[in-house]
Amino acid sequence: MNPFWNMPSASVRKRSDNDEKIATADQKISPARSSSAKKQLPSIPKNAVPITKPISPPLSVQSTNGTHASYGPFYLEYSLLAEFTLVVKQKLPGVYVQPSYSSALMWFGVIFIRHGLYQDGVFKFTVYIPDNYPDGECPRLVFDIPVFHPLVDPISGELDVKRAFTKWRRNHNHIWQVLMYARRIFYKIDTTSPLNPEAAVLYEKDVQLFKSKVVDSVKLCNSHLFDKPKIEDPYAIIFSPWNPVLHDDARERMLAQKKSEEQSRGLHVSGLSWVKPGSVLPFSKEENSLQT
């Protein structure tokens, strides 16, 4: 049974008496009203908020990339996943990347140069993606060891990516294009507005000395190939010397898989032919069989 329903009548009587006293006091304070006037509610103060009026909800918080803050992180994660899928589909020759374990905004990578002035070069790098991607500036690409190149800062090792992407355009520019640009600079040298003026001048004035410094730079990068990563991360790219016990078997399996893929591709492409081997004439019955 509700205890409030069993309150003694005396307490109820006392409360009613108090209410009457308060009402009498209010009547004394309030101005006299004419009997002919209609009943009116007391005026509301200027700064008062009506109790019945609900407080308006706060404006929706927008994240830096224009999406709602509640699902902004999920949108960013989806965008980066889509970008990495595009990188895998492009199959950039000699370029390998791996997102960091600690942050999807940081990717580890390596470029293998197979011909040209920087032949045999193995250059490790890190891609830094802005936290408001894809609406912010273009990603940054920094080589672990500064490469002697007109477009690479000789101190920080950062590549001049903004040269190719002056304004990052959403849904038009992609991270795989940045990786392709980083690969292309080693095959097509550009000396306009360089980050390394010495490299640019040598390429224009003394190509032989430029080649000599490039060879030294390649040797320096390769000599540090087996060093520990500068950033401790489980997904960082690590190189180790060739170990026949570990690597021979893996190498054979990779080559066998590649050979089987080439054979299956060749069988699929060849198909059936109605052309006689060694000629351009279609198959036909032998003349002797026609005479008989």
Swiss-Prot record:
Q: Which InterPro entries match?
A: Ub_conjugating_enzyme (IPR050113), UBQ-conjugat_E2_core (IPR000608), UBQ-conjugating_enzyme/RWD (IPR016135)
Which UniProt keywords are given for this protein, alphabetically ordered? Apoptosis, Cell membrane, Cytoplasm, Membrane, Protein transport, Transport
User: Known Pfam families for this protein?
Assistant: UQ_con
Chief subcellular location? cytoplasm
The UBC core domain, residue ranges: 75-223
| CC per GO annotation | FHF complex; plasma membrane
Query: Which spans does this entry mark as compositional bias, Basic and acidic residues?
Result: 14-23
Q: Name one GO biological process term.
A: lysosome organization
> Which family would the database say this protein is a member of?
Belongs to the ubiquitin-conjugating enzyme family. FTS subfamily.
* The protein's name in its UniProt record: AKT-interacting protein homolog B
**What is the scientific name of the source organism?**
Xenopus laevis
In the UniProt record, what gene is named as encoding this protein? aktip-b
